[in-house]
Structures are given as structure tokens and as C-alpha cells.
């Protein structure tokens, strides 16, 4: 399925139904009073998250969503039916903005979360409500309310436990393919991965966590070079960052520092997230390779997705980080301060 992480749609809540102008007409009641019923309320527009959705692709094909209109009131004080609500399903991690003002309306991160986006118009009141001692036969009703309309911008930020970050050809796609059932495109040239991929890693005792393979970052990604700016936002919601550098890349310490620098330029709070340094492709590592400590407090693991070297230790470390209750606290605190 094609991955789409932004979309714009137009929603229209239903108008209310008209109030009825009617008078009671029965045998032996020649001068019955007003009995016009109220119109029904217009349908609301709701957004609801669905954890099974991972893309905004559907909104590229359908951009207009209309709720039902309330039916009109009738005589004998009969109230019209409310218009049908419409529920639009979106992936978890969807940020919803007013397209006109850019104001964030909702940030939907929990499965099955439901948010009212546009209110239906109220039903007009029938003439039964307007009789007075001096106006016993009102020949008018209250006009119905209009349903709210809104243009919405959706931005999807993937919900994953671990985000794999690295330069093109660092081995991210190969790693996620051997750790999970994900099957991203893999080839020996840069930018094979053009969209993020999600994989579920099965751990011992029926535990599991989600890993996201983010398309390769290059130097200058925070300024829009390569594919970086388009996809860096997908690591904002991850709990743990796994920073990958290839053993055959030359200066792995410089590459690691460059990756951290690009993330800091995009959002300095990302560096508050717990991270793991991973040296990949150890099966083709130079014989004289010396793996540095990179930085204090960061676990460094050397792995090979081809031979399986270090993968068990990597899964263990990822699980420890993901299951830590305070794993994302510093990052969230800083985001709230901003």
C-alpha cells in the first residue's frame, strides 16, 4: 500500500431541518391551535482513530465528506429525524489542523479516540412554540441552523516504539526485515527506502514492540536536502532512537555526530530521547575497525543482519529501553514547555 503522510479534506456538517407551520385540524375542533413540529438536528462530523490504518492514502481519492441533513418537522407536533452523523477514520498519530488558521484542532494518538470536528445545525422550531395570548395562530417557524463546514489538514506522525535513523545504505531496511515480518525494498544503492516502514518485533513471553525504518537522512536534511525533512517528523513520537552507522562507511564517529546534528537542527528535544548506537554490517567491517564509545551513557552494539551477530543483544536492549516507564519523560516535558 502506498504511504501518504499528509492530506487536506473538506467536511460539511448537516443543516438542521425546518420547523413546521401547521394547525390542529380535527372534527369538532374548528379552531385548533398551532401544532407544527421541530426540525431534526443536522448530522455531526467526527474523527476516530483506527490502529489498523497506517497511511492517509484514502484521503487522496476522497476529499469531501458530508453529514446528513435533519428532516423537517411535521404537523401534530412531530419532530423531524436528526441527520446521520459521519465518522471519518484516521491512523493513530494524526495531527489535525484548521487549513485556514493552521491551528491544531486535535492530536490523535490513542486507538479508538473520537473527536467532534464539525457540529450539525440545530433544527428549526415549529410554530407551536410561538403561540401567545395575543398571537394564537402564528404563521411562521424558526429557521434551522446551518451545519459547520471546515477545511482540514492532516499530518501523520508514525507511532512507533523505536525509530531507526541513519544515512542511506546504513542497513536499516535489512535490519527491520530480519527483526520483524516487514518486507521493505532492499538494494545496494542510496535511497532504496522512500517511505517509512513499520515492523512488529516479537520478543520473549509474547511481548512485542514496533520499529520504524525512517528513509535515509543526509547531511543538510534539516534544511530540506534529500528526503530527510519530509520524514524526520516521524521520529518525534518514537520512544527510543536507534542510530545506525555502517562499519564500512569510513569515519563512523563523524557519521554518528552528523546524524545527531541533523536531528538537533530539526528539533533539539529529539536528543533528550534515549538512544542506542548501532554499528551495522560487521560482516564486511575493515579488519582494523575500532568502534568508539560515541558518547557517555549510550549503549553501543555491533551487529550484522546477514550473519545474525548481535541481534539478540539488540532486541534485549531495545526492549529494556521501550519498557522503561520514564523513557520519554524528558522529551515530553520539553515539548510541553514549548
UniProtKB/Swiss-Prot annotation:
Residues 121-145 are annotated as: Disordered. Its cofactor is Mg(2+). It is found in: Cytoplasm. One of its GO terms (molecular function) is GTP binding. One of its GO terms (cellular component) is cytoplasm. PROSITE patterns: G_OBG (PS51710), GTP1_OBG (PS00905), OBG (PS51883). Mg(2+) binds at residues 173, 193. It comes from the Bacteria. Residues 1-159 form the Obg domain. It holds the Pfam family MMR_HSR1. SUPFAM superfamilies: Obg GTP-binding protein N-terminal domain (SSF82051), P-loop containing nucleoside triphosphate hydrolases (SSF52540). GTP binds at residues 166-173, 191-195, 213-216, 280-283, 304-306. The keyword Metal-binding applies. GO terms for biological process: ribosome biogenesis. Residues 160-323 form the OBG-type G domain. Belongs to the TRAFAC class OBG-HflX-like GTPase superfamily. OBG GTPase family. An essential GTPase which binds GTP, GDP and possibly (p)ppGpp with moderate affinity, with high nucleotide exchange rates and a fairly low GTP hydrolysis rate. Plays a role in control of the cell cycle, stress response, ribosome biogenesis and in those bacteria that undergo differentiation, in morphogenesis control. Monomer. This is GTPase Obg. It comes from Chlorobium limicola (strain DSM 245 / NBRC 103803 / 6330).
Amino acid at each position: 500500500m502506498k504511504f501518504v503522510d499528509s492530506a487536506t479534506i473538506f467536511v460539511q456538517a448537516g443543516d438542521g431541518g425546518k420547523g413546521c407551520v401547521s394547525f390542529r385540524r380535527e372534527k369538532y375542533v374548528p379552531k385548533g391551535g398551532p401544532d407544527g413540529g421541530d426540525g431534526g438536528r443536522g448530522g455531526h462530523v467526527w474523527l476516530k482513530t483506527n490502529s489498523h490504518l497506517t497511511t492517509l492514502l484514502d484521503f487522496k481519492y476522497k476529499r469531501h465528506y458530508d453529514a446528513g441533513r435533519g428532516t423537517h418537522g411535521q404537523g401534530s407536533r412531530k419532530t423531524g429525524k436528526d441527520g446521520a452523523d459521519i465518522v471519518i477514520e484516521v491512523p493513530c498519530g494524526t495531527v489535525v489542523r484548521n487549513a485556514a488558521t493552521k491551528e491544531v484542532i486535535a492530536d490523535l494518538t490513542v486507538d479508538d479516540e473520537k473527536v467532534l470536528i464539525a457540529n450539525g445545525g440545530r433544527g428549526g422550531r415549529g410554530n407551536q412554540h410561538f403561540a401567545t395570548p395575543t398571537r394564537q395562530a402564528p404563521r411562521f417557524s424558526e429557521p434551522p441552523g446551518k451545519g459547520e463546514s471546515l477545511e482540514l489538514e492532516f499530518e501523520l506522525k508514525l507511532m512507533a516504539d523505536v525509530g531507526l535513523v541513519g544515512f542511506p545504505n546504513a542497513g536499516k531496511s535489512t535490519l527491520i526485515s530480519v527483526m520483524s515480518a516487514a518486507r521493505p525494498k532492499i538494494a545496494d544503492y542510496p535511497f532504496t527506502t522512500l517511505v517509512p516502514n513499520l515492523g512488529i518485533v516479537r520478543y520473549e513471553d509474547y511481548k512485542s514492540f514496533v520499529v520504524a525504518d525512517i528513509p535515509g537522512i543526509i547531511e543538510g536534511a534539516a534544511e530540506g536536502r534529500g528526503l530527510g525533512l519530509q520524514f524526520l517528523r516521524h521520529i518525534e513520537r518514537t520512544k527510543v532512537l536507534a542510530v545506525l552507522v555502517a562499519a564500512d562507511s569510513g569515519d563512523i564517529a563523524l557519521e554518528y555526530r552528523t546524524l545527531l546534528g541533523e536531528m538537533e537542527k530539526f528539533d533539539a528535544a529529539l536528543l533528550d530521547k534515549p538512544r542506542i548506537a548501532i554499528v551495522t554490517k560487521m560482516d564486511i567491517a575493515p579488519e582494523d575497525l575500532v568502534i568508539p564509545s560515541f558518547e557517555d551513557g549510550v549503549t553501543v552494539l555491533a551487529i550484522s543482519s546477514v550473519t545474525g551477530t548481535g541481534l539478540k543483544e539488540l532486541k534485549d536492549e531495545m526492549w529494556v529501553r521501550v519498557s522503561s516507564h520514564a523513557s520519554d519523560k524528558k522529551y515530553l516535558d520539553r515539548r510541553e514547555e514549548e
